[in-house]
UniProtKB/Swiss-Prot annotation:
MF terms (GO), sorted A to Z: nucleotide binding; RNA binding; RNA-directed RNA polymerase activity
Taxonomic placement: Viruses, Riboviria, Orthornavirae, Kitrinoviricota, Tolucaviricetes
Record keywords, A-Z: Nucleotide-binding, Nucleotidyltransferase, RNA-directed RNA polymerase, Transferase, Viral RNA replication
Keyword Mitochondrion in record: no
Free-text function comment from the UniProt entry: RNA-dependent RNA polymerase replicates the viral genome.
Protein's UniProt name: RNA-directed RNA polymerase
Length: 839
């Protein structure tokens, strides 16, 4: 009874729960009848919400004893005499008088039917009006369904008549005339009999009502029928049973029966914290619900479309939708997804990544005349390249690429190579994009040439590549090109370069859309470097065909055609090599001309420069104008003064107690939980990610436990590493045949170095590792994801933020934790084998 009394007490004129809280009668005296009634209504609503909050939080008793109906009937009560209804005579039953038909009400007119409110069947559907039997299975609920909110159930709110509401609003417009207007507009209200003037005998409540509450009635409904959906049929069932319990079992009065049964009904459908923990388990929190994240359509429309782009709609458009599968497990804040394969995305990608730098038609920088002629590359060691045979080319590939290039080589035997084979086929890259960091970036496009052209071009580029990387590397004391080195070798190289300077500082160079800014002059300079080592007229012809690119892009619902001069085609065989040649030689020329002693490390368009701090200002003043003169927009990143804070290819060096190695950013945890392959390949993909990652990150805080979790919950790896999308992960070069999976113990040195690198304290590191070590397999609707089909996976528009994302926030560098003193300078002449022996 306390449940309803706490709500109804506010109607009593003199009731006040605490000193200083005005009663209803005092509110009438101070604010008038209208405002007093609204205040009372608000107080009653808050009291009702408090009861529902107590149900949600488990703060109310739900095990109050409910006497059985039979026991209640045995109690001495004055039984009411009920007259037996008269039965019709046989003659009446056999009569055929149909006069009752005429007495039936007439059916509604057409106008009435058209103006009526929709029925429940029309609103909810007939299927929702059925009573759902209790199945005993757990109902999966999302975190957003059960988080506390100001109003946790839809409690009915009484409202005053419109005329009274308008009068109250009028007082707000003219505060000074509030009381006068209320007096002028006061209606003659009908007299209502209050109290008990006729001495009507009132109902007496049964003894159980002294302790009974709505929460106990709601739990009784749960015990009888389970936790059901709030369909109209289930509402009718629950309300009827609750009224029977209160009337026949507890001896409740009419008022108590109605109000308490209504409140108990809301609680029956309202989930509690215990429901979340028991019914839904740990879904959407730690176990990792698997979601199908919808592909993304760019919302940015080009304000200026390049006149070179010709757009054509497909005659028979196909579905453009792509889906990425995300494991919503404990991890940093991220929302990884993939762009749809649509004409809309393709047009923006080509427009902003080939012709313009934004959607407003801003052209990329053009190099100054003769700018590349000043770059000296005479220091490169001379060597001669022996071309491969075409059979060597296709045999160097695996999987589907091997089949494709074998077919291309066979076709070259029947039809010679022509300029038309140099045409470019463009498509939207199925790239994992963090849409929380970049809400609407321009989609990236891949622009490969025909396999026939690539097969012939590979005859020269494949043997040239490793030799030219080595020649570039020997421009410095330690290698300046990271290609060919694994994570440990790269970490040792960075550490040794750092140790060469008394007061080192590292500056990262980030070229904005590097491929787009590779002009014809930049291509001619790069090809001039190639020709120093490859002497072939066929090779020269292939290089000339790359200056003007005729491209055709395809999406599921349309096509584009365009022609562009220059630009690095992202699918070209020499994309990585050409970018390394440009960045190393351009940056080296700048620093040499400034007279700054330095060390360089490059991987494509990702470049870092290490120097003494005294030269930093001179370098910063010169770097942007220098690259602008060459046609590049260069962003100079913030300098770092601690070895562990050096950013290179989304990794940072960490010392594990024995050696330095490059460790991926902590955001890789979220990225590894996203995949864009087929659902059936998801277990194999997770297993491959874990196995490849642990080969490099064994013994590294957080990563060690997370990657072993992926291996534990994945499936058989199979041939997933031959998948075309595997290259996008970038783990192959990161590993390079290394296996440190046997290193399972995380050293104290590793924890301190990891804290300096990523700002996660050793205490938080251990807490995260304990969570990953205890996690089971990801789920779909409460079932192991390996046992369900893709149709069972819930599709969402974006990954929801979680309250545990802040566990991974960088809390700042801890200089005391840096392990820079453990750098071994090594030998003057660097060789990879010698470096590995030192590790």
């Amino acid at each position: 009874m306390a449940t309803i009394r706490h709500i109804m007490d506010w109607l009593r004129p003199t009731f006040t729960p605490l000193a200083g809280v005005k009663s209803r009668q005092e509110c009438i005296a101070h604010y008038g009848d209208d405002w007093a009634l609204m205040i009372t209504q608000s107080r009653m609503t808050l009291s009702a919400e408090a009861q529902v909050n107590a149900w949600y939080e488990g703060g109310a008793e739900v095990n109050g004893s409910i006497p059985s109906v039979e026991g209640n009937a045995a109690a001495p009560q004055a039984a009411a005499v009920v007259a037996e209804p008269p039965h019709p005579s046989p003659a009446e039953n056999e009569g055929e008088d149909a006069s009752w038909v005429a007495a039936l009400p007439a059916p509604p007119t057409y106008e009435v039917v058209q103006g009526r409110a929709p029925t429940l069947e029309e609103i909810h559907g007939a299927s929702r009006l059925q009573i759902v039997p209790y199945t005993g299975r757990a109902r999966v609920i999302g975190e957003d369904e059960v988080l506390p909110s100001p109003v946790l159930s839809s409690i009915w709110r009484a409202t005053r008549c419109p005329g009274r509401i308008l009068r109250v609003l009028g007082t707000l417009l003219k505060p000074g005339a509030c009381q006068r207007h209320l007096e002028d507009l006061r209606e003659v209200q009908p007299q209502v009999c209050v109290g008990n003037p006729c001495e009507v005998k009132l109902q007496e409540e049964g003894a159980p009502m002294a302790y009974m509450n709505a929460q106990s009635i709601a739990m009784e409904l749960r015990a009888m029928f389970g936790w059901q959906a709030a369909t109209p049929a289930n509402r009718e069932l629950g309300n009827r049973v609750a009224r029977d319990i209160l009337r026949d079992g507890c001896g409740a009065t009419r008022e108590q029966i109605w109000y308490m049964s209504s409140l108990a009904l809301h609680m029956w459908f309202q989930p509690t914290l215990c429901d979340l923990a028991i019914k839904a388990g740990a879904q959407n929190f730690l176990v990792g619900e698997v979601y199908a994240r919808s592909g993304v359509e760019t919302k940015t429309r080009p304000k200026i479309l390049s006149p070179q782009i010709k757009v054509k709609l497909a005659a028979r458009p196909r579905p453009v939708k792509r889906v990425s599968y995300n494991v919503d497990v404990l991890g940093p804040s991220a929302d990884y997804g993939v762009h749809n394969n649509s004409l809309n995305n393709l047009v923006r990608g080509v427009n902003e990544r080939v012709f313009y730098t934004n959607n407003q038609g801003k052209l990329p920088l053009a190099p100054a005349a003769g700018a590349y002629q000043q770059i000296d590359c005479a220091a490169l060691k001379q060597f001669r390249v022996t071309p491969w045979s075409l059979d060597d080319v296709w045999m160097s590939y695996k999987g589907s690429q091997r089949v494709r290039y074998k077919q291309a080589v066979d076709s070259l035997g029947m039809r010679p190579l022509s300029k038309s084979d140099a045409r470019v086929s463009t498509f939207i890259k199925a790239e994992k994009v963090n849409f929380r960091a970049k809400p609407d970036p321009a989609p990236r496009v891949i622009q490969p040439r025909d396999p026939r052209f690539n097969a012939v071009f590979a005859k020269y580029i494949k043997p040239l590549e490793p030799l030219l990387y080595k020649a570039l590397g020997k421009l410095y004391k330690y290698p300046c090109v990271a290609k060919g080195f694994n994570a440990v070798e790269t970490g040792e190289i960075v550490a040794k370069k750092w140790k060469m300077f008394a007061n080192p500082v590292c500056v990262g160079l980030d070229a904005s859309r590097f491929d787009q800014h590779v002009s014809v002059d930049a291509l001619r300079f790069t090809h001039g470097v190639y020709r120093r080592f490859v002497k072939s007229s066929e090779f020269d012809k292939l290089l000339r065909w790359m200056y003007t690119n005729r491209c055709r892009g395809a999406a599921k619902d349309g096509f584009v055609k365009y022609t562009v001069n220059g630009c690095r085609m992202s699918g070209d065989m020499d994309t990585a090599l050409g970018n390394c040649v440009l960045m190393v030689l351009m940056t080296r020329h700048l620093l040499m001309s400034l007279g700054i002693p330095h060390e360089l490390l490059d991987n494509g368009d990702d470049c870092i420069v290490i120097m003494d701090q005294e030269h930093l200002a001179k370098f910063n003043d010169a770097v942007k104008p220098y690259y602008s003169n060459l046609g590049f927009t260069m962003k100079v990143e913030e300098p770092v003064y601690s070895l562990e804070r050096v950013d290179f290819c989304q990794t940072r060096p960490v010392y594990d107690g024995k050696k330095w190695r490059m460790v991926r950013h902590i955001t890789s945890v979220a990225k590894d939980c996203c995949t864009v392959i087929n659902w059936e390949q998801l277990p194999s993909w997770l297993s491959a990610i874990g196995e490849c990652g642990i080969a490099v990150a064994g013994g590294i805080p957080v990563h060690n436990s997370f990657l072993r979790y992926l291996m534990r919950v994945g499936g058989t790896k199979g041939g997933i590493e031959n998948h075309l999308l595997w290259k996008n992960e970038g783990l192959s070069w990161y590993r390079m045949g290394m296996d440190l999976s046997h290193e399972k113990v995380v050293s104290d040195e590793a924890r301190l170095s990891f804290q300096t690198a990523f700002g996660i304290s050793p205490t938080m590191q251990r807490a995260l590792e304990d969570l990953y070590d205890g996690l089971g397999a990801p789920t779909v609707n409460g079932c192991d994801y390996r046992t369900v089909k893709t149709r069972d996976c819930r599709e969402i528009e974006c990954m929801p933020p979680r309250h545990y994302n802040h566990y991974f926030i960088d809390c700042g560098m801890q200089p005391a934790g840096s392990q820079e003193q453990y750098v071994n300078p090594g030998y003057t002449i660097f060789e990879a084998a010698a470096l590995w022996a030192q590790c």
